[in-house]
Structures are given as C-alpha cells and as structure tokens.
Amino acid sequence: MKVKAPGRINIIGEHTDYNDGYVLPFAVNRYVFLSIEGSDRFIFHSENVNETVEMEKIEKLNKWTDYISGVIASFEKRGYRVSPVKISVSSNLPMGAGLSSSAALEVATAYAISEYFSFNVPKLELVKIAREAEVEFVGVRCGIMDQFTSAFGKKDHAIFLDTMTLEYEYVPLRLEGYEINLVDSNVKHELSSSEYNKRRQECEEVLKTLGKKSFREVTKEDLERLSGTLRKRAQHVLEENERVLKSVQALKEGDFETLGKLLFSSHESLRDLYEVSCEETDFIVDYLRGKEGILGARMVGGGFGGGVIVLSKKGAFGKIKEELVESYKKHFGIDLTFHEIESSDGVQKI
C-alpha cells in the first residue's frame, strides 16, 4: 500500500502555534511518499538517505527513523498492536527549508499504519499521534500546525487554524495573477539543537510571570508588566496573532497588497522581537523589499536559516531571481534554491 503526505508552508502566524495562537498555512505540492508491507521485523528504508535500518523492536536511534518509530510508539501507547512492517520512504520535499518534511513523514506513517492495519483512526487523532511522535519521541517541542496541515490540506485553500481549540476554516487561496515562491537560504538548522526550545521556555516564562494559563489570556496591557526579552517575545506573539486575522480578511477579499505588507511586518517582528531570523534570511527579505511586483516576504519555519516565502505578482519574481542569486552568492558564498509553491490536498492513498 502506498500513501503520500504533503509538506506545508505557513503564510503567516510564525511561532504562534505552540502559544495557543492562530496560523494560516497551506499544504504544498511536494510530498513524502511511503509504502508499507508486512515483514518479520521492522525495516525502514529511505531512498533519499539511501539507508535501510532493521530492528526487532522500536527504538530511538537519533536519526531519520525516529519519526517513523515515534509514530509506531504513539499507536502502541494507545493500545494498538503494530506488528512488524517494512516501510519505504522517498520525498521531493527539501529538508530544512521550512516546509515541514518531518511532519509529512509522521503523517504519512500514521495514515499508512491506520489504513494498513484497518485501525480506522479519525484524521484528527492521526494528527495528534504524529505530533506526539515529534514531541515525545524525537524531542522537538513543536506545535500542531505542521501535522494538521499535512493531514487536512485542501487544494486552492489555506487553513485558518486556531491552535488552542483546533477549530479551523478553509480560506480560498485564489492566486490568479499572483504567485508564491520559497527561497531556500541553504543555511541549515536542526530545530532540536537550535534556540527553538529556548523560545518555548521564554513564552512559558511570560505566562508564569503574568499568572496566565494561556497566551490567549494575555493582552496588550499585560506587556507593561514585562520587560526586556520576555516583553519582546510576548509582543511578537500578540501582534502576530493580529496579523493572522488581518491576513485571513485580506485573502477573503483577494487583497494581496495588504497581505504582502503583513508578511514584511511579520518578518520584522521575527527579526527584532522574537530574534529567530539570521543574516542570510534578513538579506533575502531586505533585497526583495521595494522591488517591482514583489508584494511581501518573510522567513518561514523555526528560524536560524531555512526559507523565505515570497508573495509577488505573476512573473515579477522571475525577473529579479538572477540578481538575487548573484548578490547572495557574493555576500555569503552560498547558492540559493527556489521552489514555486502551489497548494495541495492532504494525506491520501496513491
């Protein structure tokens, strides 16, 4: 049996998903492909890494297999019996560019196991199983957005998701005359070892200081009670949530000019208040600002490298691509990679 699960790009709402905030992602037309069959032991094969790993029982190896093993462990924790299987994966999702290749692998695994063993697990439960694999097994304290989008994606739509209640709404993504590109800085970050978990701790510290249970209870007035780093982190989360709401409205009205401006201000906030951008992604965003037909850009993903999402009028980005490549190479000695991004449906059998 074969399945595919898409990666995702988040239009706006960065570092809000683990703070009970709003996000606006969509599933992209790049996938993890996975096949599953019975076996006498667990065999995991990755075409991309060109490696096969065998194990008698599920164990943590601190490598790519942990995403698969973690999902199986989550099923078993819930009382499902997963007998040994051979799982083969391949992907056309770029790693580390902010498109959530890990979540796509987890969702593909969860969906394949549920279907193969006829567990008939509801989609939302599969999302929770996939996320639990990353948080508890892999050890990255991610929010739920990535797995949710890979499972619930819908072509030609973004998902306006409230990560606190998991209520969601499909918002039409009509890009006629516009395009979305991803620029990969090719500066790689591994979330586990980066500042990501530190930002989570800082946000928990904010809540502790204010005596609140959730960021949804935090108001602009509360910022006065904070200072220094904690104030900056809280201000980003509050304002980024507002930007998501404005972006949903802009998308519904087909107002891409406003959406673009919101992307630029999101990047500034991620750079100055949340402090998760880096020299390379800042350079890309600054370079694009003010160029003809470029409506907006911001870093995407956890930060410290990765990708930049670019919203532009159709064809405008292509005209300045070469200059950007040369300029970036001159500054950093690194080549850029580009991906034109289209929306996609969520996880499915193939």
UniProtKB/Swiss-Prot annotation:
InterPro entries: Galactokinase (IPR000705), Galactokinase_bac (IPR022963), Galactokinase_CS (IPR019741), GalKase_N (IPR019539), GHMP_kinase_C_dom (IPR013750), GHMP_kinase_C_sf (IPR036554), GHMP_kinase_N_dom (IPR006204), GHMP_knse_ATP-bd_CS (IPR006203). The active site is at 146 (proton acceptor). It is found in: Cytoplasm. ATP binds at residues 46, 96-102. It is an enzyme of class 2 (transferase). Pathway: Carbohydrate metabolism; galactose metabolism. GO terms for molecular function: ATP binding; galactokinase activity; magnesium ion binding. This is Galactokinase. It comes from Thermotoga petrophila (strain ATCC BAA-488 / DSM 13995 / JCM 10881 / RKU-1). The gene is galK.
